[in-house]
């Protein structure tokens, strides 16, 4: 206990179906602080988009690999039967529209009574019909990697999304009773007062369709496009982020200490702090978001389920 064993570089299997399912036997019996079980499940490893210039997951999770959606739905059904679990936290970094469509079909085909969430990008392929189907299958919460309301900043981050399309997608999800959590980044390289105001304008327009939002300060991670091309983005790396000492040797995570060319920063730029402060002053004039926007993941899922029950999809007749 307390010993770390290192046996060499980890090998990422190509065929995820060869991996055994996780064993939750010892956790499932009174091992949760939640009122009901919430279990993780995954369909893919790595990110199918894998182009965001700020994201460490492009390297940390390796290349994109996926499991058959039918196998994921079957695993969820087995946990429903064995552990009485109907709430599932999908840990995939990005569930693209094609995979969400197939997973929803598989869940509906099994007649599985479940609730789950996914993380996604606000692209137009998340059509109203797909979101309707996903809600019928049990999707009650989507975390959207929106990052910014400025098209210039989205292009600079290489998100592959459009501001106007994003607004349509978020509103369509809300129409189906799906809880929208927006993940925003403040202080990214290239941001300025105009970009910040564009973000505020977007949030004003989308606010009535949002249940929760994270306002994250930009973090420079190793092995990202931003860190590999600091001269291009006006950044200077000051060093790694030391988290602990192991047997007298420093251990660093992927976070890098940095400053912008025009700043005297001591490892973290004041730009992000200033933008977040401006946002905090701005949002007091907006209606308060539901409480579940400030809950941990498992509790957010339970709360989103309860909220969706009030607006269960099916109130409008439309083909899925």
Segments predicted by a language model, with ranges:
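Acidic, low-complexity intrinsically disordered segments
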Residues: 1-71
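Short, glycine-/Ser/Thr-/acidic-enriched flexible segments
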Residues: 11-12, 44-48, 54, 59-60, ...
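Exposed loop/turn and edge beta-strand positions of beta-sandwich/beta-sheet ligand-binding modules
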Residues: 37, 84, 140
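Structured alpha-helical segments in the cores of large, soluble enzyme domains
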Residues: 40, 44-47, 72-80, 166-174
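Hydrophobic residues within beta-strands of alpha/beta enzymes
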Residues: 55, 86-90, 142, 211-213
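Conserved Radical SAM active-site core
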Residues: 57-115, 128-129, 133-136, 175-176, ...
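A structural motif corresponding to the C-terminal lobe/cap of the Radical SAM core domain
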Residues: 66, 108-301
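C-terminal non-catalytic accessory extensions
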Residues: 293-320
